[in-house]
């Protein structure tokens, strides 16, 4: 897939995952030490504890402190404090009729076990993982002051090959890779998934009719809507922050250019002009500009288009290939695909300019997508000759690999916060 994407870009310029496994490959010393006490011995209790521990580890902001006793036993806050925990999560799971009651407390181990948070929920059996992610969000926000991202979702393309045939599917899963759902399945390529700002729809490119077309699909119902189906390229859809427009790439007039599609009226407006190829648009979070990739300077570089006056300015100058750029939601950084010495890695640059810093180093990385809290970057890479997903923190100090158990996983997209 990596070679196919690069080959496609050069051509333009010359004429089911069951779950994802976490592997922490690099960490930091400033993580907050926290202990997750057992929620009980039954399956639901163990699953909740495991999910919370995994979530907080993925965030890169916490160091998990293990208790001295067995996995099904609870330790006192004072004991866990002696082992190094600053905070302790303790929970209980009970069956109440055909419902499950889950209670948890978050205690400050430094302040003699002072209770910071306590809540009780009643759920159905199929809501166990969702509640565990919600508890993780509550704990994360209480201790960091920031909203948690554990109840968000990810979309990606899964490719399964059998002999000479390929099966493409657009998958949506929890942020930790569990609970995957196939929104679409096709024998032809599916590309470029992008979440709507409200998290209810995904835009994508389909080749199901042996040509490129842009669709949106409802995550809840699977209902689709055809957006563009012009001769030639229909690609790289990106939502405006208000969800009312899509920026797309069309070659209907010759050279690929960026257009704005009004989703209410269907009207279109051309945004870029000239003889160079313009592609991969991404709106800024404030809706005032677009980042896009263009060869107008002689090599693929990132440019910024002001939507107020149409002025275009070059953003990247380092290296001879920078592409797939997007702002972090807080607009402090720009994340991109950066080539250096024939190695394709994920790079980051301050929004105001300056050098590009590599966040990854495998040389086979692509498709960066930033978490809604701006702290993590999800991306596609290769590991043991397979397409897998990786996560790296925006400062590069946390790196994780999420290997798929079957098929190739590619082109990830992180959802916004979900209500």
From Swiss-Prot:
Keywords: Cell cycle, Cell division, Periplasm, Signal
Subcellular location: Periplasm
Official protein name in the record: Tol-Pal system protein TolB
HAMAP family in the record: TolB (MF_00671)
PANTHER family the record matches: PROTEIN TOLB (PTHR36842:SF1), PROTEIN TOLB HOMOLOG (PTHR36842)
Gene3D superfamilies reported in the protein's UniProt record: TolB, C-terminal domain, TolB, N-terminal domain
Protein species of origin: Legionella pneumophila subsp. pneumophila (strain Philadelphia 1 / ATCC 33152 / DSM 7513)
Superkingdom of origin: Bacteria
InterPro entries: 6-blade_b-propeller_TolB-like, PD40, Tol-Pal_TolB, TolB_N
Family: Belongs to the TolB family.
GO cellular component: periplasmic space
Pfam families on file: PD40, TolB_N
Protein purpose: Part of the Tol-Pal system, which plays a role in outer membrane invagination during cell division and is important for maintaining outer membrane integrity.
